[in-house]
From Swiss-Prot:
It is found in: Cytoplasm. GO terms for cellular component: cytosol. SUPFAM superfamilies: L-aspartase-like (SSF48557). Belongs to the lyase 1 family. Argininosuccinate lyase subfamily. Its EC number is 4.3.2.1. Gene3D superfamilies: Fumarase/aspartase (C-terminal domain), Fumarase/aspartase (Central domain), Fumarase/aspartase (N-terminal domain). InterPro entries: Arg_succ_lyase_C, Argininosuccinate_lyase, Fumarase/histidase_N, Fumarate_lyase_CS, Fumarate_lyase_fam, Fumarate_lyase_N, L-Aspartase-like. This is Argininosuccinate lyase. Keywords: Amino-acid biosynthesis, Arginine biosynthesis, Cytoplasm, Lyase. Pathway: Amino-acid biosynthesis; L-arginine biosynthesis; L-arginine from L-ornithine and carbamoyl phosphate: step 3/3. The gene is argH.
Amino acid sequence: MKLWGGRFTKPTNELVDEYASSIQFDKKLAAYDIEGSLAHVAMLKKCEIIPAEDADKIAEGLKIVLSKIEAGEAELSNEHEDIHMNVEKLLIDEVGPVGGRLHTGRSRNDQVALDMRLYLRDVIAELSDLLKAVQQSLITQAKANMDTVMPGYTHLQRAQPVLFAHHMMAYVFMFQRDVERFQDSLKRVNKSPLGAGALAGTTFPIDRHFVAEQLGFDGICENSLDAVSDRDFVVEFLSNSALVSTHLSRLCEELVQWSSAEFNFVELDDSFTTGSSMMPQKKNPDVAELVRGKTGRVYGHLMGMLTTLKGLPLAYNKDMQEDKEGMFDAHETLKGALQLFAPMMESMKVNKESMYKAVSNDYSNATDLADYLVNKGMTFRESHAVVGEAVLHCIEQNKYLLDLTLKEFKQYSEVIDEDIFDVLKPEAVVNARSVEGGTAKESVLQQIAKAEKLLESAK
C-alpha cells in the first residue's frame, strides 16, 4: 500500500505506477533529499514537535538509508513513485513506525523544491570551477602566442590582422560572464522553500529559519505559494547553461574550421580526434563537433522547461515532475564538454607560419592605409574611396598592397611616403591598435593580467 493510500479504495493501475514514477531519474537527488530530511527532523526536535528520542532515531535511520542507497543495497521501487517516498519507506523499514513522524509539517512539494536547490547549488559551484579551468587553458594558449598574427574575420571574410592571443582572450571574457551569471544566480537559488508545505504553510510551530541556517541557505522563500510553484531557478540555470554552450559551440566551430586543410591554423591533439572507418588519412575533430552538436540538447531543455511552466496555475502540478531530467542532462552535458575542453585547448598546436601567410596574402591591411591617409589630412570617406580603388587595382593585377611600389601608391595619393611599407606590415597593423581592449601586444598583455586577477580573486 502506498504511504498516501488511505483515501483510496483500490490500488493504482500498474501502468500508471510505471508512467508516473520518477524514481529512475530523481534518485540522483537521494543525498540532497536526506540532507534536507536531517535538517527538518533536527528542527522538529528543537521545536519539540516530535519527541527528541524519536528524532534521534529517525536521524540515525536516515544515515543508514543513505549509506545503503549509495552502496546500491537499497531497493528503489516505482510503486513508491519518487525518491521522497522511497526514502521514507526505507526509513520506516529501518526504524519502524516512528519513521512516519519525519514528514510532520512537510509536503513533497516543498521537499522537492529544496532538493533541487541543494543540487543546483553544488552544480553551479562545479561548473564554475570547470569554466575557470577552461579560461586558464585559453590564457595559457594566449601567453604562448603573443607574437602569432592571424586574420581576424567579419562575415567569415578576412577583415583585419589580430593576435591569436587576442582571439583567445575574447573567449576568456565570454566565459568570465558565464561564471558571473552562474554566481549571480546563487542569490536566487540559495533560498529555502522548506516549511511552505503543500502550498499554504503548516499548522505546526516550525522554525523555517533554523532549517535554512542548517542547510547553508541565505534565507527563506517569502511566500509559500511561490516557494512550491517556483522553478525560475531551474530556468535560469538552463539559460545560463545554454549561454555557456553557445560560447563553447562558437569556439568549436572555429576549431573545426581552423583544423581543416583549407585553413591549417591549428592541429588538435590525436587524443581529442578520431579516424574514419573507411578513409585511412582522416583525422576528425569529433570532440569539437560533439560539443557543438550537444548545444542543441541544452537549448532543448531550456525550451522544454519554459513550455512546461507557461500554462501552469499555482501551485504545484504534476507537470513539474518534468523539471528534473532536463536539468540533470544539461548539467551532465555541459560538465562533459567543459571537462574535455581545457585539456583539448592546452594540447592544441598552433601553426604560426600558416596564420602569418594567410594574413600576409590578403587585403586586411587596407584600413591601415585609409587611416594613414586620414593622418595625412584626408577625410576618412575620401581615404576609404581611394583605398578601395587601390585594392581593386591590386585584385586586377593579382597583387597585394605591400606588392605595390611607391610610384604605384602615389598614383592614388601624393601624400604617401616610403614609411607606408612599415605601416602595412602585419605586425605593425596589429601593434598600431594599442587602444584598451585592442589587439596590440601591450593591450593583450593588459587583458591577460586582468583575466588572471579575476581568476585569482575567485579562488
